[in-house]
Every structure is written in structure tokens, then in C-alpha cells.
Amino acid sequence: MNILFAGGGTGGHLYPAVAMAAMLKEMVPGVELSFAGTASGIEAGEVPRLGYRLHLIPVRGLKRGRSLSALLSNIGVLTDFAASLFRAAALIRRERPDVVVGTGGFVSAPVLLAAQLLGRKTLIQEQNAFPGLTTRLLSILAREVHVAFREATGYLMKKRGVFLTGNPARSFPQRDSSIGREAFGFDPLLPTLLVFGGSRGARAINNAVLRHLGRLTAGSNLIWQTGALDFGRIEKEVSPGRNLWIGAYIEDMGSAYAAADLVLCRAGASSIAELTNLRKPSVLVPYPHATGDHQRHNARALSGPGAALMIEDRELENPEAIEGVIALLHDRERLQMMGAEAGRLSAPEAARILAGRIIDLAEEH
């Protein structure tokens, strides 16, 4: 059995594919797994590190906006897409995958389209409440489309073969909070806030935390992943302390989640899947420039039933926003209620279900 995953650019598009690949290895010994991605995406480093083959497809994304520069750039993108489609078709002919699985990002479009034109079976896994352009266009020819949020189905022209499956996410061992806090050298009795901004960081969140760092670490622990882009700047202004851990990237995310009573982060689909699977209450700050404003759709899917609070990016300038986070961190009863609601939205078996569907498609004749 040969399965090709197409997706990446950010962790939100890559990690669901990685979770499905890991489950396929467990369920089908000897399965051949490879990934198509770009040299500039997170997959360029992560996929080889995880031991999978990576096929590089040069592709650029469309620029948003109506300016002349955006128009000229997009003309070039469309020209480049033809070359990307040709490269993707050559890859499909060479690898002869039984199923091509698309998880979003720029690279998924030429690879999925090439597979469909060459008669290969395709499955699309859509992480967001508002589906990306590739999903909306190519779902029509896909054998199956699996969505993480019920809201996503309303944006698809395809109606048959669409399933509400949830997002496959990284799995973490269940650990007691005291063990997680011990891993960061923290006082195990203090409430703990975990802050991160996705694989690239989040400047607005980082600036808000930096402005209110004294309040955030007064009577509580703080685990703060700044992202690589901001770490150098923040490192010059902040030193780790007894109840502060700061770094560009958290290697031991399992301990970080275990330690946390509350999580402050962007509303990326992979993060939301991890939060709900682990029953973690959260404060979600949607990235305001996300394609189709999909992060706001994601955040509302959790804030509506009470599993999370949603704060707009611009509201982080207001001191009351961080004061609200601090108050929530110390409200144990409300945190428990939010965690229970998060658990009701979880899909811990998503990776196994999707792997099963991929296997079924691969074995069809």
C-alpha cells in the first residue's frame, strides 16, 4: 500500500497528516508513506526528521487584495501553477500512490488536482470551520472529504461523501499537573498559564504578555513559547525566573499541556484539536489575517458552547483583556466547566477513523 500526503506550509496543515501517517504505520505494517511539500514550509525540516520521504513541489500562493501588485503577482502565480501541476503529475506517475491525501496549504492544490486528472483516488481532510479554497474547489472530484467542524459542510458544493470526523492531532500521554510543572521547575501549587502562537509565533500575543509580564507571573506560573521570529527580541528584555519558562519552541509539549490550567493561543485547527482532546480551557485570539477569516470561525466553534473565550487581536492592546485572562486562571470552578465543554467537542479517534478510511479506499478495486 502506497499513500501520498500533500499539505504543509504551517503546522496546522502538516501535523494532521503526520498523525494519520503514524496511525497508518501502526495499522498497516510495511505501508509506504511519503509527503509532498515545499522547501519553504515547516515540512521541509519536520518530515525528514520524522523519517518520511519528502517530495518538493515549488508552488506559490495567491496574494489577497485588489492592488496592481497583487494582480501582477497572481498572474505569475497562475503561470507557476502550471509548472507545479506538471511536476506533481510526474510525481504521481512515478510514485503510483493508491490514495493521495490532501491536508491543505499551497502544495495540496497541484498534487490533488494532478492525482484527480490521472484517475487516482483522493481524500481531503479539512481542518477549519471555513474550508480553504483548495478544499472548496477540489472536493467535488475527491472520493471523500472529512471535516472537523459541522459548519464547514455548509461551504462545500459536494454533499455526498462528506464526513464529520474531527481533526487528527498529536497525542500526548496523560500526566498529572504536578509532574508537568516539575518538568519546568515550577511550584506545583501555583496555577499555570501556557502561551503560544502557533509554529511561527504571534507578535500581538507576545507583546501583550511582555507588557503585563509582572501581573502574569505574580502568583502563577507562565510557560511562554514566543516562536522563532520574536524570541531574540524578547530574550533581550526578559530572563527566565522561578515561575517563568520562556523559549522559541517547546520541545516537550506533553509536559506543557499537563502543567497548564489555561492556554492562551491562536485559533489554529491543530491547536484546537489538541486542546479539546486534552480537555483544556483556553483563551483564543484568532489571527485577523487568516485566509477566509477561518480562525475566527474556529474560535467561535469553541467559544459558543463555553469551551473557550475569544479575544480579538486588537483587544490585546486593552489592559482589561489580560486582566480577564488572569482572573480566569484563578477561577478553578469556571476552568473545570470550560474543560468539560472542551472535552465534549473532542475527536480523539479522528486519526484512527481517517486511517481506516484511507485503507478502505486503497483496497478498493
From Swiss-Prot:
The organism's place on the tree of life at top rank: Bacteria
Example GO molecular function: UDP-N-acetyl-D-glucosamine:N-acetylmuramoyl-L-alanyl-D-glutamyl-meso-2,6-diaminopimelyl-D-alanyl-D-alanine-diphosphoundecaprenol 4-beta-N-acetylglucosaminlytransferase activity
Keyword flag Membrane: yes
SUPFAM superfamilies: UDP-Glycosyltransferase/glycogen phosphorylase
Topological relation to the membrane, as annotated: Peripheral membrane protein
Chief subcellular location: membrane
Organism name: Chlorobium luteolum (strain DSM 273 / BCRC 81028 / 2530)
Annotated metabolic or biological route of this protein: Cell wall biogenesis; peptidoglycan biosynthesis
Species classification: Bacteria, Pseudomonadati, Chlorobiota, Chlorobiia, Chlorobiales
Catalytic reaction list: di-trans,octa-cis-undecaprenyl diphospho-N-acetyl-alpha-D-muramoyl-L-alanyl-D-glutamyl-meso-2,6-diaminopimeloyl-D-alanyl-D-alanine + UDP-N-acetyl-alpha-D-glucosamine = di-trans,octa-cis-undecaprenyl diphospho-[N-acetyl-alpha-D-glucosaminyl-(1->4)]-N-acetyl-alpha-D-muramoyl-L-alanyl-D-glutamyl-meso-2,6-diaminopimeloyl-D-alanyl-D-alanine + UDP + H(+)
Alphabetized UniProt keyword annotations: Cell cycle, Cell division, Cell inner membrane, Cell membrane, Cell shape, Cell wall biogenesis/degradation, Glycosyltransferase, Membrane, Peptidoglycan synthesis, Transferase
Protein name according to UniProt: UDP-N-acetylglucosamine--N-acetylmuramyl-(pentapeptide) pyrophosphoryl-undecaprenol N-acetylglucosamine transferase
This enzyme's EC code(s): 2.4.1.227
Family to which the UniProt record says this protein belongs: Belongs to the glycosyltransferase 28 family. MurG subfamily.
Single GO BP term: peptidoglycan biosynthetic process
GO CC, alphabetical: plasma membrane
Subcellular localization, as worded in the UniProt entry: Cell inner membrane
Enzyme class: transferase
Its job: Cell wall formation. Catalyzes the transfer of a GlcNAc subunit on undecaprenyl-pyrophosphoryl-MurNAc-pentapeptide (lipid intermediate I) to form undecaprenyl-pyrophosphoryl-MurNAc-(pentapeptide)GlcNAc (lipid intermediate II).
Binding site for UDP-N-acetyl-alpha-D-glucosamine: T10, G11, G12, N128, R170, S199, I250, Q295
